[in-house]
């Protein structure tokens, strides 16, 4: 068993997992807490039913809205998602022909930009920091820049070098070694607990209720549950917890390997396109499930899982179609794939795009920026997760973002994650923040939604979950007020956010601050207030203008 010192380390490291893996649903928090009304229930939700009641009382007509989810893949066979999937009516399923001549064969429900024509799919990928570092290493290692252009590239090289190499004090290797030891000990304890509980899969709560009969059982139970409590909570299963630890260890190994070895060309070995040519767009396949659908399936369900069917949980919006676009691997996404995914969504009629991904390097940022501009020109709102590093994104990097070299996007909203007092606090401990660059906070802790692999459901946490909450509210607004522009829709979400007078935790410093100190609006999103604000905007006689360019100069490109 793990000795006392290692147990302390294990608990600390397990706590680190909270930023990367699942959060367990705590018993005292309802599964749908994020949708509840704060005034009547005491939970810091978005007053969703109150919004529906208002729409009903006003006899508002609902028009179907198309939301694209750019993510890791979606379980298109899930009982709560299959009925709401977008269907490309111009494409004949399974005939192997590009019927609509858009360059993508059999894109019936969407497209997979990280797949090959031979049916293979990109599952894992390297980190962008490593890709940038090794691309520029030969050019700049041991050299000094002269021109302004060279100095900018050199600065990016040094930033990537610091990210990849760091202090290189051996701490990463020792952490990995310890985690592998912890994994071995956890598996031993798990084997014993499986035996005494009489089942292969059990929750922490079930293990907690078991009365041990031997000292060995007592030690195994104490060690396993002690770490599990700090690594997600006792509602998760033994397999979910151990798998999360294994995945986290693997991510650290990938980062450690990058210190000495160039990244593997995971993507180009499968997709077959010219990665450096944005115009080479006709690549990928139509496999939307692929091998990494957990994240995307959960996000899609948050937005639009079939409501009121008494299965699992209800989505935010009840008249939405989901367009599935796979562009995010286990690792960092490529700018080309994100740019093409945005353009695909826009060209096929998406009105809102949910983007629960991000990275701290973007070597082809102009490709993504141009795609965001293109979306603006077609009146499409983009909703983006702020990230899970508990960092201030006013002073650090999180891409994509609305900051362009020559201005600022007006059709992109950035979302931080909120919680509940009964669930760890009003702000999520992992959420990125920023007085200038995070627009609003939305529920992102223990969000119950769809999971892949046979009509499953469960809780996950992250700004990745807060993002589709906002996308779902935006879709609900557009259902009832379809003439709203993307800019107006962004205004509705932001201006209707409920400003918090209560001090909250700064996710990074843990200081008590006002929400307005760590976000632009200082507010939590609220569907009911948003619907009221949308009504005001729709009743104005101000001409609708869709901005095609940027109106405010940004501070970093």
Task: Specify the residue positions occupied by each region the protein language model found.
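Active-site glycine-centered loops adjacent to acidic/histidine catalytic or metal-binding residues
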Residues: 71, 387, 462
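Subtilisin-like serine protease catalytic core
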Residues: 53-67, 74-274, 278-334, 408-411, ...
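C-terminal subdomain of the subtilisin-like protease fold in secreted/lumenal serine endopeptidases
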Residues: 346-348, 352-355, 364-366, 411-414, ...
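Extracellular S/T/G-rich loop segment that most often corresponds to the catalytic His/Ser-adjacent loop
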Residues: 380, 401-479, 483, 487, ...
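Bacterial Sec-dependent N-terminal signal peptides
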Residues: 1-28
